[in-house]
Amino acid sequence: MYDLILLHPPSVFDFRAKRQFRGPIADVIPSTDQFDMYALGLTSIASYVEANGYRVRLVNVGRRMVAQPQYDPEAHLRRLRARVYGISLHWLPHAQGALALARLIKRLHPSSLVLMGGLSSTYFHEELIREPAVDLVLRGDSTEEPTRRLLASLRRGEALDSVPNLTWKRFDGQVVSNPQTYAPAAVDAFDLPAYAYMLRSVALHGHLDDLIPYEGWWRRPLTVLLNARGCVLECATCGGSASAYARLCGRASPAYRSPERLLDDLRTIRSFSRSPIFMVHDPRMGGGARLARLLDGLAAERMPNELVLELFWPADATFFERVAASVRRWSLQLTLDSHDEALRTGNGKFACSNAEVESTIEAAFAAGCRNIDVFFTVGVPGQTLASTLATADYCERLLERFGHLRRLRLFAAPIAPFLDPGSRAFEDPALGYRRLATTLADHESALLEADWGRTLTFHSDAMTRDEIVEATYALTERINDLNLRYGLSSAATHAAVVVGIGRARARDTAGAGPLDSAWMFAKDEMNWPGSEGIRPTLRLAWIIATGLVEELRLIASRALGRYDGRVADEGVAAPPRSAVVRSDAPAASTRRPSR
């Protein structure tokens, strides 16, 4: 019997029996429209509590349901017994799937406890705890240690009043919300993601099907370096903005991972893959000294993998020359949101002129950048249908200037299906959004709509839901034509997207489903050149061998009743904001409306 089984649900639990047109809600992410890619925190929780002696397992229920038509989640979960079942509700599009999974677990294992966690769970914890199938909710962005304390209290038969960040129900049904006091200032004690844990689990326990991050990952793995928890920017529509983290997690500034820990993650990734490594967050967050340590370390590693960097504001030739001197192959991802400088500034990222954007692109290519992906968004504050269509003209301008290189790729996607809870767009009506869903139950119901346009739970003062849908199709049509003209996509890919958009406009759901979910962009357009499958190395063998030694240690510790021997001590005081390099959010974007 396990102490904890962590579960990742699909977006809609019975999607295989439903006829839904999910549209382009997942076209620019690696996973399918069931959002079968689990949050990185699930692996760090599993790794941390296991290191402290507890038996834990992670099951990507959503991925297995997507990839394996014969997979029966009820039969599988009936066989897996645990004291606590932890269900991820981090991203709000999992609202229906997470709650349905909680109800299934409570029916199959009524004497076990159902735990919910993630940022969306944090926001809606008071509503979640009233759900009969939910016994516990852990709040915040770093619940590794609170989860361990919860399991320790249950093992010792103690009351749960001392577990930080916990909302729970007593046996008589009384709801208790313990103080939310745990927000570690540093997160080096946790593996984010816990690649070594995943590799050991697969090698020693054969849990490959349960642990694959999303469908297709095994063939073309994309790995991640997590720079920090939290952010320095105030992007209006982002539930991971500075004010959202302050509101939901009590975090005054990001908790950065040290360059040394990032480099250790990189070595682990190299042990099993030569595929691209994506760094989440702008690497300049945290200051120049931290950036220098990271780049110096990368130069010493001489890693063969391509590094994909995310930029939040313009960069100059000096920065790119440092990057080029540190890694052999590197690419960029830029989220511009809009060509309109005022709209872009109001939302948060790249609050600068278009000339500065183009100067950044030019400097990056001059320094040897392999590819640059530029993302535009439909539905940012103040954006009209006409403004969205004008973005296509700017895309053409970018390709006129850089298209001959065939290394600039342009994408567009709507804010869909929901506004992020805790974001300024969700909280502040002054930004011009009109919410059509307020409660978790509202969002759960919206996910059952037959068409993605009806699933949208908002419109703006500038665009109706129908206009957001049409703007998405129209902008993507233009980008698709530009990609063909400039040799960035094949005739077959162009034709497939034309057919997809035509079917979308006609609301033709024939063949719709999670394995056929790329309507606006063919999925092969999102693949990074050079992606390769898994490959064994001596370091991988060493990781597995040390994992076996660790497994024997854990077995002995459990037999002797010795638990909680590797407790993290990261502190809870947030570092001062002086560590922040800069925030390009305008003054109006720094308002932090109270919940």
Model-derived features with residue positions:
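Canonical Radical SAM [4Fe-4S] cluster-binding loop centered on the CxxxCxxC motif
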Residues: 214-258
